[in-house]
Amino acid sequence: MSSFENLRIVDNFYQTSLFFPMPTVIISTLCEDGSTTLGPYSLIQPYYVAGKDYYAMLLSCRNSSNTAQNILRNGKCAINFIDDNPKTFKEAVKLSWPGDKPSDKMPKCKFKLEDGITQEETGELRPKVLTDAIEVIECTWVRELDGADKDKFYIF
């Protein structure tokens, strides 16, 4: 007899029932009005780590999410790695509801934000980064990477 228990697969099964040793990150992106919005993710991993003129990360997210739509629209995001403090996770969960508008969730957000190094160095408008992040990767969407220039974004 197996020592494992058979679990019923439910919505968000990977968050509620499975263990993947993945970091939890907060992705910061720019809204249409230039303000920063945040979304928590754990489905992120290195994509290209060597042998290229650049490095790449792979983010799995719904194409209709605010995060995906903002990245497709302006090609910028920051990957903010957060600590594993329960208070930090509680704050991350508040940002995770699909359909929440940035204008509704961001005023209640307790994460402190600051300009990232790229914006300071270039003056280019970029998503703000979490002040208390363990580390931050500031990213630019390479639209042509592996045919990504064929991706579409939708305005709902």
Provide a role label for each language-model segment.
Residues M1-T37, Q45-F156:
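Active-site-proximal mixed secondary-structure blocks
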